[in-house]
């Protein structure tokens, strides 16, 4: 059957123009149709009959200014339309019209003809020719996901931080923080700075033992409203008669640079983090800096009677240590606290005095004596 259909085996003269090539192609499909009808095959494997080629397709003419093609240029095109290539070559079946002239009615007629050759998987043919301009109605809408949520958009490449899911952070002293959180944690704030208690201590896993890392802590507001202590409820509540506060980003306190093995075995100790507040702004900047003592890089400025939440971040450092990349961050609700200038809840004051190793011994004795008197 190939010898009947293949143009190369019929000793025909190669077409000398695009118009002649088009007519030869149409005659080829007519010959293909008659050959497939005359060949007897089982009903399960026999392909559907081809429709008759429209007279419009045969009589259609190409533009007069169409460039003429030599027989050498058209020879490889003829080989692409043998029966084996059309029916069994998967690459050509995907888009058999790739090398055909895209000319209006001709392309539409050929498309319908090819879809009936293999109706189960019709070839994907572009609806418009590449040479034609895109119509206004075919413009991609702005809400299209291909434009809005593109994987390689500029915002994704610049601002999306890729987190390492293998890195896990947990609170080392979670039970202690939970006891304070049940009552309502308060943190005393001075101009010179004061350590947090309970201390910030974390456990981490999933790091590369040989790479260098460092941890950082900063504060975020846990409520936009100023807090007031309700003595009847014995807890802090939002002061709703005031406007919401716009917070400035707090500074970040960085820990020591360690390798992954040491951080995973010893944990992350951020006990040197302090918070401070400047109550009197009439002081000069030099007086303010002197009142805060030397460790300026370990203090975070906060507002009084506001609720804050510590944020822990882990950075992976380059070999030179000059560049860092954030790989994980975490917050824990039980570590939220209210900044105060004086303790309002006496239970919090007692727990801090007895549990804080930095508290003076005489203060601890006073609290223990008061507790003993209350028990008696």
Swiss-Prot record:
Source species: Caenorhabditis elegans
Gene it is expressed from: sea-1
Keywords per UniProt: Activator, DNA-binding, Nucleus, Transcription, Transcription regulation
Region of interest (Disordered), ranges: 38-76
Portion annotated as DNA-binding: 171-364
First-listed, main subcellular location of the protein, grouped into a coarse class: nucleus
Gene3D superfamilies per record: Transcription factor, T-box
A single cellular component GO annotation: nucleus
Function per UniProt: Transcriptional regulator involved in developmental processes. Directly binds to the promoter region of the sex-determining factor xol-1 to activate its transcription. Its activation of xol-1 transcription controls sex determination and X chromosome dosage compensation to promote male development. Has a role in the fox-1-sex-1-mediated determination of sexual fate.
UniProt cross-references to InterPro entries, sorted A to Z: p53-like_TF_DNA-bd_sf, T-box_DNA-bd, T-box_sf, TF_T-box, TF_T-box_CS
Signal peptide (from-to): none
Origin superkingdom: Eukaryota
Gene Ontology MF terms in the entry: DNA-binding transcription factor activity, RNA polymerase II-specific; RNA polymerase II cis-regulatory region sequence-specific DNA binding; RNA polymerase II transcription regulatory region sequence-specific DNA binding
UniProt protein name: T-box transcription factor 18
GO process annotations (BP): cell fate specification; dosage compensation by hypoactivation of X chromosome; positive regulation of transcription by RNA polymerase II; regulation of transcription by RNA polymerase II; sex determination
PANTHER family: SPADETAIL (PTHR11267:SF204), T-BOX PROTEIN-RELATED (PTHR11267)
Subcellular compartments: Nucleus
SUPFAM superfamilies given in the database record: p53-like transcription factors
Regions annotated as coiled coil: none
Biased composition (Low complexity): 38-63
